[in-house]
């Protein structure tokens, strides 16, 4: 399985590879080095990757040195500190690798999100639109786990399904366009699964606003890259049409929220290209900063009003 993200905010995409057997790999993209305003291109015109999982502490070795059977992985800034953290779903204890200045520490046990239920997949999403990323892990042996992020290392699990679904992988997206993230869980068909069952794929509709009468707001954003140069500033303004790899920081009055358009994760799936920001009770944003792949950031200082 793979999970792609710009973990070090240097403008290029890095690749995490979870392996069923053996240590996991992490390929750091070193095509570009430096800050967005002072970038150095390596002489090699092709992407230049170096494997650094062990160095960064995310190889996830087990005591028997065959790894922990990584089956799902996803990047997300769960603590809103402007760098992407990594959640790894294992057939063993899951991991939450907290990213602090490009140094990783497993905090899953401390934050009580290390589900040991044969997890196959994982998805980040702000399901209650409070400005913090929540977490959904798809499991085989027991029901899926839903962790609602309360902040300061606290998570609420009362929203977890109470039935066994045998989920292969999971993605989050606003299926019905109401501003609240829904979840699609792909069922796993096994010849000799638990109780001999063959599990059906499930679509979970988010009913948070119906049941809690939440007043939290939200913003959706769709980016589109261009092959043309507009600013004549010496930089190429070219970006792929789907804006893969673009990173956006939404500036609220008391909080900055970062999201990224990713190229893929887990068992051959990806989250929607449309970015979703929960804004808590804020009616508007102060602005946003868009970091296009491999170029200067573009800052929109105009007032952004929630949809």
Where does each model-flagged region fall?
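Gly/Ser/Thr/Pro-enriched helix-cap/hinge segments flanking short amphipathic alpha-helices
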Residues: 155-167, 180-307
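Surface-exposed intrinsically disordered loops and tails
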Residues: 33-46, 59-66, 234-238, 298-301
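Beta-propeller blade repeat segments, especially FG-GAP/WD-type strand-to-loop junctions
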Residues: 23-52, 93-107, 142-157, 195-218
